[in-house]
Curated annotation (Swiss-Prot):
It comes from the Bacteria. GO terms for biological process: acetate transmembrane transport; succinate transmembrane transport. This is Succinate-acetate/proton symporter SatP. The chain crosses the membrane at residues 14-34, 36-56, 64-84, 98-118, 123-143, 149-169. Belongs to the acetate uptake transporter (AceTr) (TC 2.A.96) family.
Amino acid sequence: MGNTKLANPAPLGLMGFGMTTILLNLHNVGYFALDGIILAMGIFYGGIAQIFAGLLEYKKGNTFGLTAFTSYGSFWLTLVAILLMPKLGLTDAPNAQFLGVYLGLWGVFTLFMFFGTLKGARVLQFVFFSLTVLFALLAIGNIAGNAAIIHFAGWIGLICGASAIYLAMGEVLNEQFGRTVLPIGESH
């Protein structure tokens, strides 16, 4: 009973993060309006599934995974609330500069988390580096009121989300086949 191997919850968290990030950034680059698809993904897959993955990382004793997944899951839930509450008449629309500060704080958090990846897989490093850049650009774009920066950030977000999906599938397939199917740049 004490030797039970626990499943790796990281692919669940990475998929929740990656898919939701791609959908939101398809909006940021101008392909789709901000609608119920993005908001639902933000609540359930980006939010709740990532928090669940983080709690499973806690069970495994992984402080980094716990901190990353529960924090970014909470990010998605707060972002959805920020976007939905004005539509429900609960608050005014968010001030763009204050939204930029919110995103900037997430960028600082992500930069510190990036440093925590430096002994990990190269793809994980890329996910956190590109996410740091994404948050920085979104913060600057909102604070400056510059739609072009937000649009450019959207392209970074698409790359970031795709890299998270690649890492998730790499972890699943590599474990499933017992060999490297998708290289993720594992450190040894």
